[in-house]
């Protein structure tokens, strides 16, 4: 398939797109689809996408980083990867990342994460810092910092993410999102959040939204939210997670932030280092919204190149 990429001439787009291939990898008991690009001897980057995205979210970034060996899996429960009934808690999700690193035989990759991938990335780095050489988080507050802000209503944080309580309802969110109206709203939820009008890659947005045709297509990824809420309201699970936070992250951390993010407060996010237990380098991107990977991949590529 040839993709019409903004800021790239058609010929360049064709050549670069051809460099991406897909692998199917068994890890932690399920099969993952993994997009791969770049030379085998290049610096290694492992990318974790956000909600409700997929490996295609990283496509343009991968095309702008021909010097790096990049792996971008579709996470557990997303179309292309197995969708088991369970395993959507953060402990299993971080174990998935560990298993992928081992199955792909990656030697301490740079872990690049966005949104829900960032939540997984923060917790993964607390648990498994020795497996990576650096954590880069794009528009995702440290999970402990974010939960505290929700409970304390810091900078109106709970009102910025109204879909979280909606997702606690049984079956209704799945039925609505996969309706014709719901898919239109889902598309709008991407395009309405760009920092500057017209900068988001609409073709990739359409590709992502089109995957959700029936409730079973999206239930697993809504379960990410349900399991996170359950973890914080179940004393045993919450204690287990907060024990994980006691181990400081021991690799360098960079937080790249699209400053026009309406869902996550930068005022809250920039305090993430307090809960990470380490210094966090903050790299603000003025004029960029939440979906940095879809609307400012050139800027993101520049930030990551600086860290290789």
What residue spans do the PLM features occupy?
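Flexible "cap/lid" subdomain of the alpha/beta-hydrolase fold that forms the substrate-access gate
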Residues: 2-19, 30-32, 71, 78-112, ...
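Short acidic-hydrophobic surface loop/beta-edge motif
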Residues: 21-27
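C-terminal alpha-helical cap of glycosyltransferases
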Residues: 34, 301-308
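Conserved HGGG/HGGXW glycine-rich cap/lid loop of the alpha/beta-hydrolase fold
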Residues: 36-82
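Conserved acidic functional residues
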Residues: 50, 115, 294-295
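Active-site pre-Tyr helix/loop in NAD(P)-dependent dehydrogenases
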Residues: 51, 141, 291
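A short, glycine- and basic residue-enriched loop/turn
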Residues: 54-55, 119, 288
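Catalytic histidine-centered segment of alpha/beta-hydrolase-like enzymes
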Residues: 288-297
